[in-house]
Amino acid sequence: MTKVLVIGDSFASDWSVKYPVSGWPNFLANEFTVTNLAQSGCSEYKIKKQLDSVNPAQYTHAIIVHTSKSRIPVEIHPLHNSDALLHSCDFIYSDVLDNNYSGLKCIKEFYEKFYHEDFFEYIYDLIVCDIDNILLQYNVLTLHITFFDHVLPVNHRNFNALFQNCQGNANHINEHANREVFTEVKSWIKS
């Protein structure tokens, strides 16, 4: 029996908890036994924690949707902690750049004056490889995905062009793009 684990960020989370929409993760859950632990706005560290919260041996397949390399984990986001979709949100520069909330001023200053891109990319790559190695140990067939314009240190599929050209209101992409991602993921599962 095919059992699929989905972990990742908002490109894989269930947006129907807040909005009347269905995205590719919902389509996938309609056809397979799926455990979707993805959390909107989360860092790569929290994606690793999603994996740590389950026994990988229970799954035949894992889909990991990787986030931006510049997300900084926080225990409680001052703006989103009670939001049904964004309650696990971490900091990212684009979110704090134009926000007037006084509590984010120091975060904006950190990104602008102190953020060490090479360090955060290095830590990000270590976490991605750790996730991949754990799933390999359990012989879980693994699909790594990103919607961001960067290369992962593991074999992956990049849907950044789809995101750039087909933005929408379910998992950041329109219905056509969600169907396209679903079709590709379904094909990978059945191969």
Language-model segments: which ranges?
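Serine-esterase "nucleophile elbow" of acetyl-processing enzymes
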Residues: 1-46, 50-56
